[in-house]
């Protein structure tokens, strides 16, 4: 999967289209990512010792990795490619040519 935790991405599809945020978690087995402030859902929590009343908590839901594009340091969104630099495999932005790792 071309997206890693900590990458800055732009959402390119869905209700949050155009949003730029940071990847909080990558889920490679299901090809999904959790992006900060995107795809918020309301989760009902049962009452417990910490919260005797229970609560409705907003949290980020995973979105499919095909709905995001990785941004480079200059904010250019593009597809991700791989190349070998100094004997090390690195990711780079195909549009700008800038190395991401």
Curated annotation (Swiss-Prot):
Gene Ontology MF terms in the entry: rRNA binding; structural constituent of ribosome
Tagged with keyword Ribonucleoprotein: yes
Keywords: Ribonucleoprotein, Ribosomal protein, RNA-binding, rRNA-binding
Matches recorded under CDD domains: KOW_RPL26
PROSITE patterns, alphabetized: RIBOSOMAL_L24 (PS01108)
Entry GO terms, CC: ribonucleoprotein complex; ribosome
A GO BP entry: translation
Gene3D superfamilies in alphabetical order: 2.30.30.30
Reported function: One of two assembly initiator proteins, it binds directly to the 5'-end of the 23S rRNA, where it nucleates assembly of the 50S subunit. One of the proteins that surrounds the polypeptide exit tunnel on the outside of the subunit.
Record note on quaternary structure: Part of the 50S ribosomal subunit.
Entries under NCBIfam families matching the protein: rplX_bact
Family: Belongs to the universal ribosomal protein uL24 family.
Protein name as it appears in the record: Large ribosomal subunit protein uL24
Lineage, opening ranks: Bacteria, Bacillati, Bacillota, Bacilli, Lactobacillales
Gene, per the UniProt record: rplX
């Amino acid at each position: 999967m071309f997206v890693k935790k900590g990458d800055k991405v732009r959402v390119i599809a869905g209700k949050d289209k155009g949003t730029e945020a940071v990847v909080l978690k990558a889920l490679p087995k299901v090809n999904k990512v959790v992006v900060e402030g995107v795809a918020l859902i309301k989760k009902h929590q049962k009452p417990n010792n910490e919260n005797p009343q229970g609560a409705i908590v907003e949290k980020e839901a995973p979105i499919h990795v095909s709905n995001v594009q990785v941004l480079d340091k200059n904010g250019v969104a593009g597809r991700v490619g791989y190349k070998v630099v100094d004997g090390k495999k690195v990711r780079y932005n195909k549009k700008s040519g800038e190395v991401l790792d």
